[in-house]
């Protein structure tokens, strides 16, 4: 299945044919029999996705996260992306009368550009019901859109010393406790507030901070809600805008990995394929860290790797972008022929 991801195969017949056309290479990999699509299909539908879940987390934990950080330590973005499915082929994932779909919920390490934690649900699962399931540890900082607004969870975050940066809902009721001055020209408001709504005040009875920031490129103003008081308003606004990195990640994997078309129709097959796809991305990141420098982005990496999967070459030299040595043959008859 990882081969099908990298080689951008369509259906199970395609990887079956292409793998069997390289039998000598498969022999050196320990595969002594022909690859059968029935075998792949059976494994895809019956092998528990928890196996690939453990592989994903094992590889994720092995990646180096000690590089240079743009933001504070343990800073994560939380978001979800929906994958549309055919209602007729995937009836188990129905969430509208005419549509099926699944949703990938992801915790993303913004400083290191790495997925950290994920789970997959039916597409009708709303974000504000999943925030408490995102496996956020004490002392971490998370940023997410206002679709995740859940005042009870915000209260739990304050109790557990988990820091968050999100957007304030327009209808939120609160009273101002203190106004703060800011020398940043892009910060129009900075204040400490307390919720006064009957439900919000009970669920989150802690002082919070509201910041209004104007984007210097678009001129759009956003209202940010956070429980961080020891950082500047401009820095916190930058933390919220860094949430866009997770959107770029989703766009990248959708363009370069097969997670919009599936090889199997069962829930097990869909979840397995998604986890294997993200494991392929982690393998890319591991290779990038092992090289002296990462000379290829993920798009270039995938487009070049799929045409040389069965070639014997030094991956580290190739990945770092070292050009092949020029070999001169004085008796090159081909050159003489075309001279």
Identify the residue ranges that each predicted region occupies.
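DNA-recognition alpha helix
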Residues: 11-29
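Hydrophobic alpha-helical packing residues
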Residues: 19-22, 59, 253
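Short Lys/Arg-enriched helix C-cap and helix-to-coil transition segments
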Residues: 51-62
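Major-groove recognition helix of helix-turn-helix-like DNA-binding domains
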Residues: 28-47
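A short, well-structured juxtamembrane/interface segment
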Residues: 60-67, 127-128
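Single, function-defining residue in the core of a domain
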Residues: 1-14, 44-47, 54-55, 70-74, ...
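A glycine- and small-aliphatic-rich helix-loop capping segment at beta-alpha/alpha-beta transitions
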Residues: 93
């Amino acid at each position: 299945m990882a081969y099908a991801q990298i080689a951008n195969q369509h259906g199970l017949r395609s990887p079956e044919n292409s793998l069997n056309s390289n039998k000598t290479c498969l022999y050196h990999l320990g595969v002594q029999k022909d690859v059968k699509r029935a075998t792949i299909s059976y494994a895809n539908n019956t092998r528990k996705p928890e196996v690939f879940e453990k592989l994903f987390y094992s590889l994720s934990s092995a990646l180096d996260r000690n590089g240079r950080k743009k933001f504070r330590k343990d800073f994560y973005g939380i978001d979800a992306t929906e994958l549309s499915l055919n209602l007729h082929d995937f009836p188990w994932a129905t969430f509208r009368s005419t549509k099926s779909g699944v949703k990938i919920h992801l915790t993303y390490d913004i400083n290191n550009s790495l997925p950290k934690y994920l789970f997959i649900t039916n597409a009708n699962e709303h974000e504000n019901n999943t925030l408490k399931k995102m496996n956020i540890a004490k002392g971490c900082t998370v940023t997410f859109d206002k679709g995740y607004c859940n005042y009870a969870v915000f209260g739990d975050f304050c109790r557990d010393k988990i820091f968050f940066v999100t957007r304030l809902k327009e209808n939120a009721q609160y009273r101002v406790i203190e106004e703060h001055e800011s020398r940043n020209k892009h910060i129009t408001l900075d204040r400490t507030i307390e919720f006064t709504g009957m439900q919000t005040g009970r669920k989150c009875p802690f002082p919070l901070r509201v910041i209004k920031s104007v984007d210097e490129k678009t001129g759009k103003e956003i209202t940010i809600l956070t429980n961080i008081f020891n950082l500047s308003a401009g820095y916190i606004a930058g933390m919220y805008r860094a949430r866009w990195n997770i959107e770029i990640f989703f766009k990248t994997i959708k363009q370069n990995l097969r997670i919009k078309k599936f090889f199997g129709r069962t829930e097990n097959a869909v979840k397995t394929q998604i986890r294997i796809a993200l494991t392929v991305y982690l393998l890319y990141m591991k290779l990038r860290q092992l090289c002296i420098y990462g000379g290829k982005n993920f798009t270039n990496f995938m487009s070049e790797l799929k045409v040389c999967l069965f070639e014997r070459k030094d991956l580290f030299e190739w990945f770092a972008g070292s050009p092949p040595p020029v070999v001169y043959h004085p008796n090159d008859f081909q050159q003489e022929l075309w001279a």
